[in-house]
């Protein structure tokens, strides 16, 4: 779905290939479709928020797109506490795809992170899975940079556990654990890892 926004914004028009065939019906219903040139903008940078890939399979019974998601657990691949697939190679391919559109001056990774079932034990949160996640995804960024992609920044999601719009306080993305009742902050091992990595 990213293509529906980024391609017109980069002056490529709306996608017209087989994978987005359902757009033909929308195109016929939308009289402004021919004015896609008005959507083109000369961006200073493209901000990329990446968490996980979505794998779908054909389904005639799903309206419009005729596809349904195949969850990571079903496919027996690594996933987070939210069921999101962990796939740094997909992150790398997404960065490259955006860069190869042409006309992109810079890419900034504005969000990248994962929620895991963090447990506070004896004042310590050993979130090794989050550290592995960041290592894998930073390797993807470095690989893309070495291949000429102009990546100017990377923002880890997030400093502290916070309120998620659709999930409340249950998912924990932070490098710092927050006890919602007492407001006590505890730096997770991933927080210390980032400190050491940046030094």
Which positions does each model-derived feature cover?
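Active-site region of glycoside hydrolase catalytic domains
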Residues: 1-199
């Amino acid at each position: 779905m990213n293509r529906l926004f980024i391609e017109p914004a980069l002056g490529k028009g709306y996608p017209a290939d087989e994978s987005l065939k359902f757009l033909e019906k929308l195109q016929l219903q939308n009289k402004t479709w021919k004015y896609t040139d008005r959507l083109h903008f000369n961006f200073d940078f493209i901000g990329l928020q990446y968490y996980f890939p979505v794998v779908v399979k054909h389904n005639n019974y799903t309206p419009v797109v005729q596809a349904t998601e195949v969850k990571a657990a079903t496919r027996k691949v690594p996933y987070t506490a939210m069921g999101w697939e962990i796939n740094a190679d997909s992150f790398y391919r997404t960065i490259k795809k955006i860069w190869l559109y042409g006309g992109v001056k810079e890419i900034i990774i504005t969000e990248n992170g994962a929620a895991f079932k963090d447990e506070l034990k004896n004042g310590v949160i050993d979130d090794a899975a989050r550290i592995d996640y960041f290592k894998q995804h930073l390797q993807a960024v470095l690989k893309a940079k070495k291949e000429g992609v102009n990546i100017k920044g990377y923002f880890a999601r997030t400093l502290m556990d916070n309120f998620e719009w659709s999930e409340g306080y249950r998912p924990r993305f932070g490098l710092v654990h927050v006890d919602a009742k007492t407001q006590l902050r505890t730096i997770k091992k991933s927080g210390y890892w980032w400190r050491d990595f940046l030094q």
